[in-house]
A protein has these predicted regions:
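N-terminal glycine-rich phosphate-binding loop and ensuing alpha1 helix
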Residues: 2-67, 71-76, 81
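Conserved small/polar residues in nucleotide/adenosyl-binding loops
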Residues: 172-176
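Conserved hydrophobic/aromatic positions in well-ordered beta-strands
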Residues: 25, 170-171
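Conserved beta-loop-beta/alpha segment of the NTase-like Rossmann-fold superfamily
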Residues: 82-169
Length: 176
């Protein structure tokens, strides 16, 4: 493996349901944000570079609230998830203002990823250190004869639900 794994953090969400930039709101009495715990765990697992995938509109608030602190511990790069960054032949539908999602975030970050093995997380979800250790191990382990390598850290659905309100979750069905 010639390049070290990088961590992409999707933080372009506008917080429309939440009512603000959830990415930069503290979650404990010490002012830590969920993203702080993720970056700490990722660093402990071996990641040395983080790519923040953000909207240009939140750049200043994000750099002030998160980036400047993280730059002391990790290599940091910022990329913008802008709606008009699309493959040839596609265009933004009239009235669309929200970011497209994970695949689009990765497309916007492709140049910064630069062929390195990578993992992508949401800025406002907590994953735990084990998730970062497992994905880092996967990204740094050569797979004999594999043209492409894919991995996903998944959780039992019942462990992702809460009694404290609505949670949007995805469901993955693995077919071998």
């Amino acid at each position: 493996m010639s390049k070290k794994p990088v961590l992409g953090i999707m933080a372009a969400g506008m917080g429309s349901r939440y009512g603000g930039l959830k990415q930069i709101d503290p979650v404990d009495p010490y002012g830590n944000m969920i993203i702080d715990f993720s970056i700490y765990d990722a660093k402990q697992a071996g990641f040395e570079k983080v790519i923040f995938i953000i909207k240009k509109a939140i750049d200043e608030a994000f750099r002030e609230g998160i980036g400047k602190r993280i730059e002391k511990y990790m290599d940091v790069e910022y990329v913008y998830q802008e709606l008009d960054v699309l493959p040839k032949g596609y265009e933004v539908p009239e009235g669309r203002v929200k970011p497209w999602g994970t695949g689009h975030a990765i497309l916007c970050a492709a140049e910064a990823i630069d062929g390195a093995p990578f993992a992508v997380i949401n800025s406002d979800d907590y994953y735990g250190r084990t998730a970062f250790e497992e994905i880092y191990r996967q990204l740094t382990t050569e797979q004999d004869g594999a043209t492409y390598q894919y991995a996903m850290v998944a959780y039992d659905l019942y462990k992702t639900l809460t009694d404290n309100g609505h949670v949007a979750v995805s469901y993955t069905h693995l077919t071998l």
